[in-house]
Regions:
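Bacterial N-terminal signal peptides that target proteins for export
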Residues: 1-11
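Extracellular/secretory pathway-exposed regions associated with glycan biology
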Residues: 22-112, 116-191
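Bacterial N-terminal signal peptides
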Residues: 10-18
Length: 191
């Protein structure tokens, strides 16, 4: 019995140590480099109050019907009150969105990125997944992901997002290694 417990403990320690010392995800810059306008592009599909979007796979399945919406100013949409519209869409419930554009990094180095969402999200920057929540949650931090930015410039961004019922939020925190980790300003996003 002691051997089994020791083996299980060793496996847990190895998994935790591996995660703690994993290399940062290397981002790929946009090629060619764009000269974007401020904000992010977004396409929406609303399912009304009767047909509920329950998870990320269901949100993805309805996005083929999405229509362009008013561009987002960035990723600083704090938790709403119940019944308020989702992001720049007109509806408050059962909304799926595909968000595209670019994120600018002013210098190379190691950064931490963290998405916040209510409800689900699948977020990519520079071709690497930086956030994923497949189900329903309150306005909470998702994974904090360490990334390597090889050079200053613009990096492609793509987010699939959905909101079921209640309130909604979509935000991001970021920071360069050794510097302050804080809410990401809107001026680093372009479309």
């Amino acid at each position: 019995m002691s051997f089994v417990r020791t083996g299980a403990l060793a496996a847990v320690v190895a998994i935790v140590a591996g995660a703690a010392f994993a290399a940062p995800l290397k981002l790929q810059p946009a090629n060619p480099q764009p000269n974007p306008k401020a904000g992010l592009n977004v396409k929406y599909v609303g399912q009304g109050t009767q047909r509920k979007i329950r998870d990320l796979s269901q949100a993805k399945s309805v996005l083929s019907k999405a229509k362009p919406g008013k561009p987002l100013r960035g990723l600083d949409y704090a938790d709403t009150n119940k019944g308020e519209p989702v992001l720049t869409f007109t509806d408050p419930y059962n909304v799926a969105a595909e968000i595209t554009g670019f994120m600018r990094f002013d210098s190379p180095g190691i950064y931490e990125l963290e998405t916040w969402s209510n409800d689900g999200i699948e977020a990519y920057v520079g071709g690497q997944q930086i956030g994923r929540v497949t189900g329903i949650q309150g306005c909470e931090a998702n994974q904090r992901t360490e990334v390597e930015v090889p050079k200053a410039g613009w990096y492609p961004l793509k987010i699939i997002y959905f909101q079921k019922l209640g309130t909604s939020c979509l935000m991001m925190k970021s920071g360069k290694q050794g510097e302050k980790f804080t809410w990401t300003p809107n001026n680093v996003f372009g479309r």
